[in-house]
Amino acid sequence: MKMEEHMRTDLKRVPTMKIFDFAIFTKSIEGIVELTIGEPDFNTPGHVKEAGMAAIANNRTHYAPQRGTAGLLSAISDDVAKKIGKVYDPATEILVTNGVTEGAYAAVTAITNPGDVILVPTPTFSIYMADAAIAGGTAVEVDTSKTNFRLTPELIQSYLDEYGDRVKGLVVVNPTNPTGITMNQDELDAIADVVRDKPIFVIADEIYDQLAYMEGADQYPSIVKSLPEQTILLNGFSKSYAMTGWRVAYMCAPKPITDELFKVHGFAVTDVATFVQDAAEEALRNGQEDPAAMRAQYQERRNVLYQGLQELGWETTNPEGAFYIFAKIPDYLEQDDEKFAYDLAEKAKVAVTPGSYFGAGGEGYVRFSYATDLNVIKTALDRLQKYCAARR
């Protein structure tokens, strides 16, 4: 008897993570330069590491409060209020999670009944498609390639017209992975108007918010500003503070929604390690300059990579946030993006991520990550130029 045949059938709908299989392949190639990395190449700031180590030395190694430590919850509330002007009650409207990955899982699981539809703008990282399937719902990919990779009210409305009352959630990732597109506040306000007063939750994934390149009042656009009562806000420390391995993030929502989210969070993970939360609190309280320093370097790298691709004749997005450029494969090269990426890795020793791994609209594109040293980017461009020249 094959016991795996008797497991939950919904899991067959969970997409496989081809991106990780591709990463294993590229790492096997000696001398390859990788523009595939989805995490900062910086190390966690020293003062944040010291706070974590001090917490361990002080025996902050026991169970933490399930919702989060009082200190971190308060710091999150203050930080969110400063950035987007919304005050969440630290005692009742915020949960500390094991990364945004867990927050996304808790959010989708908590709002989805069997048969419900979650609208997921694509191209995007596949986590929300998987979460919807695990929850017994259906992720419907909203292909934004038709609108220059920007989510528009008209595009959302077309899917609402098609799926009607089945739609339970809309995911809004801003800035976006893999395109780097960042919607401004006017765009987000218009999106909010489409779902306002409908029984539709907005899951606002803002993990890259401090890596947006706008300045002044436009630096932190958020759909929370115009639709707080329907929005579940997800954010964390992985991208802005180079803390991917610490696994700490948070979710914010009105108390009645947070109480339901807590049921999923509490039974799934119990809590986030106390010393990790102490380090995250240090990041928010005393590390406000850290994201800005990283952002300045990302901008320099973006400019070099963008200019280099333009000179090679590649059609690309010009990212306004995160650390990715999404580029259309030129017509004279292999148009199957997966085949192209494997060939480029083998023959030019340059690793980029196939666009189709990010869902509808990604076909024929590849993602370049500039979360790497400037010299690596220049080497990759030089190798790409030679690869392209040999195939014209």
Predicted regions and their residues:
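PLP-dependent enzyme catalytic core of the Aspartate aminotransferase-like
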Residues: 158-161, 334-335, 343-352, 358-392
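Helix C-cap/helix->beta junction micro-motif
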Residues: 29, 135, 197-198, 312, ...
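PLP-dependent aminotransferase-like
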Residues: 109-172
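Active-site phosphate-binding strand-loop segment of PLP-dependent enzymes
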Residues: 144-217
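PLP-dependent aminotransferase class I/II
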Residues: 45, 230-321
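N-terminal small-domain helix-loop-helix segment of the aminotransferase-like
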Residues: 2, 8-99, 106, 283-286, ...
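Conserved PLP-binding catalytic core of the aspartate aminotransferase-like
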Residues: 298-299, 312-347
